[in-house]
UniProtKB/Swiss-Prot annotation:
Disulphide bridges, residue numbers: none
Domain of life: Bacteria
Family to which this protein belongs: Belongs to the TRAFAC class translation factor GTPase superfamily. Classic translation factor GTPase family. EF-G/EF-2 subfamily.
Protein name: Elongation factor G
Function text: Catalyzes the GTP-dependent ribosomal translocation step during translation elongation. During this step, the ribosome changes from the pre-translocational (PRE) to the post-translocational (POST) state as the newly formed A-site-bound peptidyl-tRNA and P-site-bound deacylated tRNA move to the P and E sites, respectively. Catalyzes the coordinated movement of the two tRNA molecules, the mRNA and conformational changes in the ribosome.
HAMAP family (alphabetical): EF_G_EF_2_B
Source organism of this protein record: Mycoplasma pneumoniae (strain ATCC 29342 / M129 / Subtype 1)
Entry-linked PANTHER family: RIBOSOME-RELEASING FACTOR 2, MITOCHONDRIAL, TRANSLATION ELONGATION FACTOR G-RELATED
Organism placement in taxonomy: Bacteria, Bacillati, Mycoplasmatota, Mycoplasmoidales, Mycoplasmoidaceae
GO molecular function: GTP binding; GTPase activity; translation elongation factor activity
Entry binding sites for GTP: 17-24, 81-85, 135-138
Length: 688
């Protein structure tokens, strides 16, 4: 089957924002105005298409990323709506990994908010081109100019308006297009009918000034255009758009648009901007992969190339079972064909291919380079794994996910629930790389760990609804970590003789702190002191032993281990012997490398009326919090601080109490830091 849409006319983009900025409402309006749906669903009514889970409908928030596709001006648009709550940041992470562009949605009253900064950093890490949509211009307190300033100050990027709102709050009724010098006045109806009129006199000077600034900024991306601009020549609309597109694709320029998704004002202009400025799959740098020899390979976005795809999400569908979401980077994948999972070196059959529209599936026969679909039938592929055909053997760059910071114990209410609970936890862990489940070796309890209380609350609720498992839930616990604070060289030797073939493994390892870099294993063996086949078992032995640290049995992180010497026995050495020797070396290091306990530190932003400012500051300090700054916004005070997660349990209730229900806060994981000695002693005592 031939390609129906040229690759140059594809747009793979996501919508990202802080919670309640209006992402899903924007997505719904895009679906409606593109003709994908014919009835507008609202998040506050639980009727939106993209928020299809029961928990999303009840809570009015997005929990899982939802994919769909629409058409606009001869272009095919793959759209992914992502969550705004920090607990579900994994959905943003894996979506941005496979998208070519994004719309960052801001609340016009709030401007840049904490989760805006988080998702912006995620997008920057993957070098995703972005346009910015200042939403809710109809909201009380909406201020476009202040929102643009917050982008420049808090995100530190070149954000330049290409639109100007006419009015704000209840008086917001039009948008000035600075590029084409046109004005659109909206009738307020759901069809978003707009009347083109001349620029009102009171805006003419401002438009002239802002357009000149826009042209000056985009001229930086084209030498000839800059020369024409400096000579005072007229710059064409086509040249301005071409240079904006160039700046956006290079992540050097971020155009700012405005509107009100809820009131159907500015959505069609936003769709025009997606087509005009966000890249197609052929506009972005070629995907990097690595061959069997470890050398870098660039993947060409071509139908004629071998098939290469990345599984970026796994979901469970009650009707068809496992859905594996895949971005196709090159080649063509057909229904009924086979793919190879490179990491697991395993072939799997593609039973069916489907294009998703939220939770609905539309079956297709094939998928081509640059597109996104879901595969039915893959049993062993998980998030972040590369799929290829038999003509190529490469692995795409891996995805990085945050580690859980909070845990709690769960137990089945009845014996009948025991097996069902194990199946449910296994399936949920397959779907969500930031959700972990394990058995506490001391108590035998089943522990679930995630990114926050809401994250775990949703997962427990899903167990009850989707898997019909009733569970008892314990109180939330902090997920502490352990690490080494001092460098030292240690030895691990395992010798076992009991008649017949014995066991022999001997390693010398240098351990040192590796702050914020995770576990790093370095092989410095020379001269065959340890045969190559035993190096990997040494690493595996260390990784297994690091699951339980020397202080209180918490997992170990941020350690560099350099294997520099050792010995072996021609007959008695084995992989198992070297695994055990490595674990003994780590145990010895626990005695000499000054182990320390690390606790998760949360970045919080508290908003309270002026009269509660002092009480709030005092309360944060009493929780071992470090105040990082305060800011006056209208008639409220915003306090930014770093506080240990251990001290934040019950904070919502306390804040509500001393602010008489008028305070609110947002919180997200910041980093791990060494725990004070007094707290360490308390924690170790509870573990004994």
């Amino acid at each position: 089957m031939a390609r129906t849409v040229d690759l140059i006319n594809f747009r793979n983009f996501g919508i990202m924002a802080h919670i309640d900025a209006g992402k899903t409402t924007t997505s719904e309006r895009i679906l409606f105005h593109s003709g994908r749906i014919h009835k507008i669903g609202e998040t506050h009514d639980g009727e939106s298409v993209m928020d299809w889970m029961e928990q999303e409908k009840e809570r009015g928030i997005t929990i899982t990323s939802a994919a769909t596709s629409v058409s606009w001006k001869n272009c095919s648009l793959n759209l992914i709506d992502t969550p705004g709550h920090v607990d579900f940041t994994v959905e943003v992470e894996r979506s941005l990994r496979v998208l070519d562009g994004a719309i960052a949605v801001l609340d016009a009253q709030m401007g840049v908010e904490p989760q805006t900064e988080t998702v912006w950093r995620q997008a920057s890490r993957y070098e995703v081109p972005r346009i910015i949509f200042v939403n809710k211009m109809d909201k009380t307190g909406a201020n476009f100019e202040r929102s643009v300033q917050s982008i420049q100050q808090r995100l530190g990027v070149k954000a330049v308006p290409i639109q100007l709102p006419i009015g704000a709050e209840n008086d917001f009724n039009g948008i000035i297009d600075l590029i084409e010098e046109k004005v659109y006045f909206f009738d307020g109806g759901k069809e978003e009918k707009a009347e083109e009129k001349p620029i009102p006199d009171q805006f003419k000077d401002q438009v002239k000034q802002m357009r000149a600034h826009l042209v000056e900024e985009v001229a930086n991306f084209d030498d000839q255009l800059m020369a024409d601009y400096l000579e005072g020549k007229e710059i064409s609309i086509a040249d301005i758009k071409r240079c904006i597109r160039k700046g956006v694709i290079g992540c050097q320029f971020f155009p700012v648009l405005c509107g009100s998704a809820f009131k159907n004002k500015g959505i069609k202009l936003l769709l025009d901007a997606v087509v005009d400025f966000l890249p197609s799959p052929v506009d972005v740098p070629q995907a990097k992969a690595y061959g069997e020899d470890g050398n870098e390979v660039l993947i060409s976005a071509s139908d004629d190339a071998p098939f290469v795809g990345l599984a970026f999400k796994v979901a469970t569908d009650p009707f068809v079972g496992r859905l594996t979401f895949v971005r196709v980077y090159s080649g063509v994948l057909k229904s009924g064909s086979y793919v190879k999972n490179v990491r697991k070196n395993k072939k799997e059959r593609v039973s069916r291919l489907v294009k998703m529209h939220a939770q609905n599936r539309n079956e297709i026969e094939e998928i081509r380079a640059g597109d996104i679909c879901a595969i039915i039938g893959l049993k062993d592929t998980t998030t972040g794994e590369t799929l290829v055909d038999d003509k190529i053997d490469v692995q795409l760059e891996a995805m990085q996910f945050a580690q859980p910071v909070i845990s709690l114990a769960v137990e089945p209410k009845t014996k009948a629930d025991q097996e069902k609970m194990s199946i449910a936890l296994s399936k949920l862990a397959e779907e969500d790389p930031t959700f972990k489940t394990f058995t506490d070796p001391e108590t035998g309890q089943t522990i679930i760990a995630g990114m926050g209380e809401l994250h775990l609350d949703i997962l427990v609720d899903r167990m009850r609804r989707e898997f019909k498992v009733e569970v008892n839930v314990g109180a939330p616990q902090v997920s502490f970590r352990e690490t080494f604070n001092k460098e030292s060289e240690v030895e691990g030797k395992y010798i076992k003789q009991s008649g017949g073939r014995g066991q022999y493994g001997h390693v010398k390892i240098r351990f040192e702190p590796n702050k914020d870099k995770g576990f790093e294993f370095v092989d410095k063996i020379v001269g065959g002191r340890i045969p190559r086949e035993y190096i990997k078992p040494v690493q595996a032995g260390l990784e297994n032993a690091m699951a339980s640290g020397p202080l209180a049995g918490y997992p170990m992180i941020d350690i560099k281990a350099t294997l520099f010497d050792g010995s072996f026995h021609e007959v008695d050495s084995s992989e198992m012997a070297f695994k055990i020797a490595a674990s003994l070396a780590l145990k010895e290091a626990g005695k000499v490398c000054s182990p320390v306990l690390l606790e998760p530190i949360m970045a919080i932003e508290v908003t309270v009326p002026e009269q509660y400012f002092g009480d709030t500051m005092g309360d944060i300090s009493s929780r071992r919090g470090l105040i990082e700054g305060t800011e006056q916004r209208d008639n409220v005070q915003v306090i930014k601080a770093k506080v240990p997660l251990k001290e934040m349990f019950g904070y919502a209730t306390d804040l509500r109490s001393f602010s008489q229900g008028r305070g609110n806060y947002v919180m997200q994981f910041s980093h791990y830091a060494e725990t004070p000695k007094s707290v360490v002693n308390e924690i170790i005592a509870t573990k004994k």
